[in-house]
């Protein structure tokens, strides 16, 4: 098992490959990496996103340190990037890194993913970077990847207090909303298409760290972040595959008004005394993903019985932002879909004259194939690769 590195400066090289165990950094700041080396089982991600509040433009980007990907022959250090432009065009990029470099100052934590084409990662001419303020007041994702994406997504938090539900979400899954809500500014260009995306909107920043490979942990996951007038809500939910929790929905929600928390809970059990949320799928709308999940939106309720408070929001998918199959059909029918959605709602009986607010949000839905299916898929790929490289039979 790899030994923990001390907090400070270190780097992770993709070429070194994963170890069997976890190299914990033991750093107290959740924006800092949890692991200082690649692991076959332990992995983590940083997600930053922003959306213009008419729903016409947005950016979502996720940075990964994920040694479990090597099981499938995939690169362990990578970034997924999706941008929606006002004319409806979509810029999608999968950026592969050779390394991750980590350093911190009194003011910030900096993580840099130098691009794989840099060989050993010693050149800095092509990279993707996150810089997060130590107090989580700001975060900036910067890209200098010629031919793909250049520019930045800058987030300035309006979240007034730390996430009270940070930590374990379910078996082998931990999560923190670094910024439940933030002002977002995008200034990005895409050399391949000659396009540019500039907008101001709202967004947030989340962190996840896992202690098992993704398909072993969960069968489904749903990510929600929405904004409507003074309100912002955010959630991550997973349906566990682990032990006695198999089939259990593990989810948390937080609701802000003007940056101040008015609701936070991990309970979706209806109660006359305890705070709870209810997230119900909607069907029959015009926009849905192409996979097994046919959800076209959600009805979301936050209830605080003792305080006599109730907030309700309608979330309706407006655009499919991305759609990625997780294997070839018919063996695999599951996938990863993202949506830009319209958000409408407010406090039930609480706002003046029952005022309803409108805005936009983004939704991510993932359904994972069974681990046995992925193992079968890996075997089929290996057989196909062997057949492709086998010498042709000699002519008689």
Swiss-Prot record:
The keyword Oxidoreductase does not apply. Its EC number is 5.5.1.-. GO terms for molecular function: isomerase activity. Keywords: Isomerase. The keyword Transmembrane does not apply. It comes from the Eukaryota. This is Diels-Alderase mpsD. Pathway: Secondary metabolite biosynthesis. Belongs to the Diels-Alderase family.
């Amino acid at each position: 098992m790899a030994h923990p590195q001390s907090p400070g400066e270190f780097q992770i090289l993709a070429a070194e490959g994963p170890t069997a165990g976890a190299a914990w950094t033991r750093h107290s700041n959740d924006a800092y990496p949890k692991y200082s080396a690649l692991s076959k089982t332990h992995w983590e991600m940083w997600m930053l996103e922003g959306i213009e509040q008419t729903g016409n433009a947005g950016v979502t980007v996720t940075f990964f340190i994920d040694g479990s990907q090597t099981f499938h022959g995939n690169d362990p250090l990578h970034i997924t990037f999706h941008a929606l432009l006002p004319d409806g065009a979509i810029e999608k990029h999968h950026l592969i890194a050779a390394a991750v470099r980590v350093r911190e100052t009194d003011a910030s934590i900096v993580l840099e993913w130098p691009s794989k084409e840099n060989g050993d990662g010693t050149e800095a001419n092509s990279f993707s970077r996150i810089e997060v303020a130590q107090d989580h007041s700001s975060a900036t994702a910067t890209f200098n990847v010629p031919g793909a994406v250049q520019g930045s997504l800058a987030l300035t938090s309006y979240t007034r207090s730390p996430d009270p539900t940070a930590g374990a979400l379910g078996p082998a899954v931990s999560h923190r909303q670094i910024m439940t809500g933030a002002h977002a500014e995008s200034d990005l260009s895409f050399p391949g298409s000659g396009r540019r995306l500039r907008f101001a909107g709202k967004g947030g920043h989340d962190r996840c760290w896992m202690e098992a490979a993704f398909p072993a942990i969960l069968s489904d996951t749903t990510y929600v972040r929405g904004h409507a007038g003074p309100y912002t809500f955010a959630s991550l939910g997973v349906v566990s595959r682990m032990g006695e929790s198999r089939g259990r929905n593990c989810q948390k929600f937080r609701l802000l008004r003007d940056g101040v928390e008015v609701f936070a809970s991990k309970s979706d059990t209806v109660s006359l005394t305890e705070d709870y949320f209810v997230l119900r799928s909607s069907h029959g709308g015009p926009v849905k993903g192409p996979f097994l999940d046919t959800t076209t939106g959600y009805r979301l309720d936050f209830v605080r019985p003792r305080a006599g408070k109730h907030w309700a929001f309608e979330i309706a998918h407006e655009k499919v932002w991305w759609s990625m199959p997780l294997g070839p059909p018919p063996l695999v029918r599951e996938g990863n879909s993202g949506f830009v959605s319209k958000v409408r709602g407010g406090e039930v009986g609480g706002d003046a004259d029952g005022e309803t607010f409108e805005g936009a949000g983004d939704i991510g839905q993932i359904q994972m194939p069974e681990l046995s299916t992925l193992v079968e898929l890996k075997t089929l790929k290996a057989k196909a690769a062997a057949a492709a490289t086998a010498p042709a039979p000699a002519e008689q």
